Structure formats: structure tokens, C-alpha cells
Amino acid sequence: MLSSCVLGASVNSLAFTPTDKSVFSEGYPEAAPITSHRFTFEQLNQGDIRLSGVLPNSDINFTNRIDKIIKELSITLQFTNSPALLTELSHIKVYLNEQLMAIMPINGLRYDQVHQTLKEQALKLKPHLVRNYNTIRFELIGHYTNDQCEDTTHTSIWAEIDQESVLEFKSQHLALESLLSRFPEPFYDEFDYTELSLPMVFRGAPNKETTQAAAILSSWFGAKANWRGAQFPVIYNTLPTDHAVVLATNSSKPDFLLDYPDAQGPTVEVIANPEYRYKKLLLILGRDEADLKTAVEGIALGLPLMTGRTALINEVSYIKPREAYDAPRWLRSDRAVRFGELIDFPTQLQTKEGSNKSVKLDVRLAPDLFTWRSNGLPIELKYRYTPPTTKALSRLNMSINDEFVQGFTLSPDGGKEIISEMRIPLLSSDDTDKDRYFSVPGFKVDVKNELEFKFLFSTEKEGFCTTSAGGGKVGIIDDDSIIDVSNFHHYIAMPNLHAYSQGGFPFTKYADLSETAILISKNPSRLELQTLFTLSGHFGKTTGFPILKASFYYVDEEADLTNKDVLLLGQAQKLTNQIKQDSALTVLLEHSLREITQAAYESQPYAYALANDEAATKVSLSSLGPLAAIVGFQSPFNSNRSVIALMATQEADLHLIEQTIRDSEGLAKVRGTATIINQHKVHNSYLGERYYVGSLPPFTYIWFHLSEHPLLLAILTLLTLLIISFVLWRILVSLARKRVETQEP
């Protein structure tokens, strides 16, 4: 029994092993397939590589899945170099995982010619040195003179490797054992940086309970995939050709599992694909649909207990419900958070001179943080660095989302820890011995932020010919640095589709979606299910936790939605029959009929944020072609709750929503109260009655809402002053009267 303040789970591994599994016995008689891969450096998220005397080193990284082995590996470099470099002395060294692979000579270029073509060099690398995570490093050795007096940081020392350079390799599948101790590999591999694509297999269209189990599992895999993204194709009664998940009860097995032993309870099992033997199937089995949900909960909460090939989930219990805003990927709002709590690997907070890399931290904030008239987000930064030996200017620059925030001078006393505190936008002193307090302006804080700290060490020279050897300086951001949002309240104007698209709000206020109702059509299509599973994966990606407590209903089902935020998904005609009577719905789609209500200043992207514009136009038309919409409005069941509808004119058009969810750039365009999506563009509408969710202290609440009505605020201020003046006058009159009375004989 595994217990904590959140959950309890009991898993029985090994003891439960169905008897007849001969058809799925291990063994790989056929030859393992070999596949070829080709990536440009740009596809590996690496732009042009610029090497110089100041920064002679740079690298690219690539990964290898746990179920594959590299058989051949090569790179084809397209590069150019400074014509000042001497051929006999200059070259580029190429390393694979710090093992020297090749020395690439640099051929001289003539000064009196214009060079427009890149040189090309193919290099074979040793595949046996490949690991799960790999680095190819390039080091420039550049000389421009035979003279003993040479400036190694001279601007004429440079070479550039083009982003169209190519990495090629051939890989062969490995025969992995079917063991839960490896899980979630090979279904999800942390060393695979591509989008996770994991098919969900059913015998036929699943019912609501089976759909819920699959959605929970999708959100769990989405949390694992994180920034990679995830999609979950839906397959009916067909054996997949890749790693896949199969959900089946004893009465709803796919044909390829008909002879498989019946489950004796909630069961999780890994087997080899009977036709594609190097692929695996994750079986989620049960006597009924309730068992499927329990099995999925066992994966989400009790995975460390699972070993062997099969696990029978005896019990999953929730000892304490989750609290609001406790999503693992969100910055905690109940206390200050150490930088050490935000890192993904031990050396993330340090960097070395010459590496051309900075310290980066991802910070997600609750989308409804109330930043009105705040002084910003407080950060106490502690850092250390190798002290410079001269007074040459070295700096530490801080940026947020690629926007410069503040710079610090690195003084010669940097061997000790320096605490920096300041307030943006005030300029700070360069005296690093002083305590300084700084804050990130609230308007720069988005749902997802990247804090970047870049140490810039200056080159130390003594005279024209003497330059200190680089590469020895180190900069460290202390893991005891803190960031604190505990003094912020939670209050936000709704509907706000940007908060939904970027943070899943309001549903993700509770990471397990315990106060969310998801409404789906009674006979969902494959694409509707696939969109639901992709959306569930997005919730998991945002919070880092599966949607274990979300409630699922059919759109025509009687349900108490009073205390729920509602998510509607499906074909527009099925959904609008339930919601089109609500006056807050500004977009209506029914087959070829399209209707939209807009404000007078609809073309202004921030018009909605400035005022509640009244409807100025209403357009109703008939048109064909793919169209989908995401619409937000106040819940008709509870004024403090929200409804978000994801709908399409036809079921096939739901792929527009799914593609938008999977595309980070497309998702960032979802804003306002309604978003209309066609094959080429995203259009936002900002019309709708504004309402607020959350809470504020009474005084702040009054002043915040009065600030939207300056004339009323001025009148109330004047009345307040008059009342205070009258009260003070009465007090003074009373005191004067008493003084006169005491002076009389």
C-alpha cells in the first residue's frame, strides 16, 4: 500500500499472470527493420553556428530512443570562414560526446573575390559512441598570422556553419522485454524530442466511461510529453503498426484479443504486438468500464510500484482532495519558491565561459493572478561567479521571454555569494555588495515564462600581445534564489480564451479538473474522440497532472452543473441545441448557417479589454467549407462559473481545433471571447458581457471596479471628503464647546 497526503494505491505485480499467452510469447523471428533519418540543423532547433576567437565552441544535440540502436551516423557540413584565416594553421575540430571524431581543414579564401557559395564537408562519425542524449561539438582553432604576437580574440577569426547542414543516421529497432519496470517507455520516451503520437485502440465507439478512462490516460501521457506535445489517434478493431494503447473490457475486446484471457480485475499489461513484433501494446483491461478507470488511475498514481509484465490494481483511494492552484507545473502561490525547485537537471543553473549558453528557467503562473497596480513579481536573485582579475567589464544580463529586464556588473569580489534585489523599472547601482530588490513588471508576466540569465565574461588583455586563456570562468545562479507570488490574489475578467488556451483556465484551477464537467455527444466520431484526447493531453501538459477527477456527461444528459465549469466538445448542431438560447453565445454554427455578433470596435484587438462594448453588428449567412469555433461565456447555471464550447460545422472540421491545440503558435492566437478557425486563419471576437471570477479584499475590490468609472470615482471621492470634513468639523465644534464650558465659573 502506497500512501501519502494525496492518494493511496495498491498494486499486485507478478502475482497476476493470465495462463494462456502463447500467441503473444516473446521472440522476434523476423529481422529488425532499419530506418533512415535525415535532419537539418534547423530541424534540430539549431540556427547558424557562429564560431569566433571569443566563442570558439558551439554544439548541436540529438537524441536516440531507448528501443533503437544507431547503425550509421554522419554529418554533412555547409560552412564558410574568414578569408583572413591561415590554411596551414586553422581548422575545426569535431567531437561526438567529447570524443574527437575529425579535424576539418579550413581552406584559404582570396581577399579580392566575393564568395557566395558555402563549402561542403561530409564526415562519418562512430555510431557505437551514440547514447540516449548526444552532443556534437565544434571547436574553431583559428590563426590569422604567423607572428608570435597574435590577438586570439581578433574579429577576423571566425567561421560559420549553416543551419542547412545535415545530420543523417540509420537506426534499427531493438527487442525490448515487455516489462512494466520500463514503463512509460517505449510508449513515451523522454529522449524522443518529437511530438508524441500514441494510438488509442477500441473495439468500437467507446461509451462515456471508457472514454473517460482514455482521456485520463491521455492527460497523463500529455503531462509526460510536456513541451513535445501529444496526439492520440483513435483506431477501431484494428491492430496498430506502432506502439499503442488498447482499452478493453471482457465483453468489448478487439478481434485480435478475442482469445486473450479475461481480466480478473483492473489490469495493466505490456505485450508485444503479435504482427509487428518490435512494437508494444499497453493493455488496459477490466471486467467492466469501472475497472478501466481504476487501472488508469493505478498508472497515474502507482506507477513506481509496477514491475513484471502485468499488474492488477487492487485499490486506488484519494485520502485528501487537491487544493486550488496546486498544479505541479505552476508556481506555488502559498509561499516563496526556490529556483532549485524549478530545475530539470542538476547543472541547469550554471554556465561556463565560452559555452555561449545561458541559464534558463521555465516558470508557469496561474492565469488569474491579479496584478492591478502591483509592484511586480518579487525575485531575490543570488549568484556567484569566477572573479575577473582585471577591471574589464563583465556582466550578468537577465531577460524574460527574450526581453531584457536588468543587467548586473560582475565585480572582482564575485567569489562570494551576491544577493541582488531591485525594482523594475528603477535603475540600480552597480555596487554588488548592496542588497537590492527587483521585481518583474506584472504586464510582462504571462502564463508561461522563460527566465534567462546570461553571464558575459569579458576578455582580459594585458598589452597588445597578451590575452588570457578563456574557458575557465564559471557563473552560477544559486538554487536558493527565490520567486514569490504568495501576495497576489486570484481575480480575472472572463471570458478569456487566452487564459484557456495557454493555461487551461478555468478548468485547471484544480489540477485534477475536479470542478470541471466535460460534455460530449452520445455517439462521438473518431475525430471527436481524438480531439478530446488531444485536449486532455494539453491539460496534462499545462498542469503536469492527469485529469483524474473530471466529470463526463453526454450533452443531452441531465446533470447538476451548478458547481462546475463546463467544457463542451463536438459538432455545433449537437451542442447549440443545448446552449443557443443563452444570450451570451456570440457565435452560432449550424451546418452551412453561420452567425456572429460583433462590437463596433471589433477590429481593435484590445477593445474588449478596455470596455464592455455593446453589440453593433450581427451577420447571418450560409456558406460551405471547414469552420470551427471556440466560444466562452458565463455559465447559465452559476454566475461564478464559465462555459467554453469547442465546436465545428461538421464533425470532420474538428481537426481544425485539434491542429490548433497541437500548434503552439496557433494556440497563442486564441484570445478574446470567441475564436473562429478556418483552414488558413484565426479570427478573434472580443464582444461579450464581462464577468469576474475569484476574490479580492473588500477595499481592493471596491477601488478596482470604481477605477473603470472615473467620473463616479471622482464624485464618491468628493462625497467622502465632504463627509470626513463634516465629521471633523463636528468634532472640532464639540471640543470647542466643551472647552468653553470648562472655562466658565
Language-model segments: residues:
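N-terminal signal peptide c-region/cleavage motif recognized by signal peptidases
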Residues: 3-4, 10
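Solvent-exposed alpha-helical segments and adjacent loops
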Residues: 14-745
